UniProtKB/Swiss-Prot annotation:
Assembly information from the UniProt record: Interacts with MPK4, WRKY25 and WRKY33.
Keywords: Nucleus, Phosphoprotein, Plant defense
Any single GO BP term: defense response
InterPro entries: VQ (IPR008889), VQ_8/17/18/20/21/25 (IPR039607)
Subcellular location: Nucleus
Lyase as UniProt keyword: no
Protein name from the UniProt record: Protein MKS1
Sequence segments annotated as region (Disordered): 1-61, 105-130
Length: 222
């Protein structure tokens, strides 16, 4: 098929215009030729499909649960009227079942443990705990009567605290009109009362009679 006809769509006028546009200027190039050696080259065969990977783990299949019995299960035949008695005998609701069954060989260890717990008194430890509570309450009441205070958990009675020793506080003394170094010099001087740098709270502290009585009591002891 002429390419001009393909592009022109079959119209004669369009074909002529297309031929004019597709005219090659200059000599036509020589056709391509294939060398003889190239004909000897053959396409290699396809590679065979790779074998399945043997290292690949098999698909995961979930395992079914395995039931482990302490006692091998066995079938026990019983009628409807004897069903409750058979179940009670095998589960062991009392210690007398083992005596009747000749040692309880057909009874599971869990049933033996349950029967042992039922036979032993569970409230054996409760009286001991109650006795300890009574002893603690009695001790607290005796301490309250001795010290004359309400018993507490953290703080002891004030009467039981040791008295403060006389040397725990350093005495305040004055020599030649000089106060102790622990007290500022201008505390009781007129300059200290009239100082513009004093705070209102400090003035009220100095003017308090309780504060003055406290220091006079210490000075009288000296």
């Amino acid at each position: 098929m002429d390419p001009s006809e393909y592009f022109a769509g079959g119209n004669p006028s369009d074909q002529q215009n297309q031929k004019r546009q597709l005219q090659i200027c200059g000599p036509r190039p020589s056709p391509l030729s294939v060398h003889k050696d190239s004909h000897k080259i053959k396409k290699p065969p396809k590679h065979p499909a790779p074998p399945p990977n043997r290292d690949q783990p098999p698909p995961y299949i979930p395992r079914e649960p395995v039931v482990i019995y302490a006692v091998s299960p066995k079938v026990v035949h019983a009628t409807a009227s004897e069903f409750m008695n058979v179940v009670q005998r095998l589960t062991g609701i009392s210690s007398g079942v083992f005596l009747e069954s000749g040692g309880g060989g057909d009874v599971s260890p869990a049933a033996r443990l349950a029967s042992t717990e039922n036979a032993s008194p569970r409230g054996g430890k409760e009286p001991a705990a109650r006795d300890e509570t009574v002893e603690i309450n009695t001790a607290m009441e005796e301490a309250a009567e001795f010290g004359g205070y309400a018993p507490g958990i953290l703080s002891p009675s004030p009467a039981l605290l040791p008295t403060a020793s006389t040397g725990i506080f350093s005495p305040m003394y004055h020599q030649g009109g000089m106060f102790s170094p622990a007290i500022p010099l201008g505390l009781f001087s007129p300059a200290g009362f009239m100082s513009p740098f004093r705070s209102p709270g400090f003035t009220s502290l100095v003017a308090s009679p309780t504060f003055a009585d406290f220091f006079s009591h210490i000075w009288d002891q000296d």
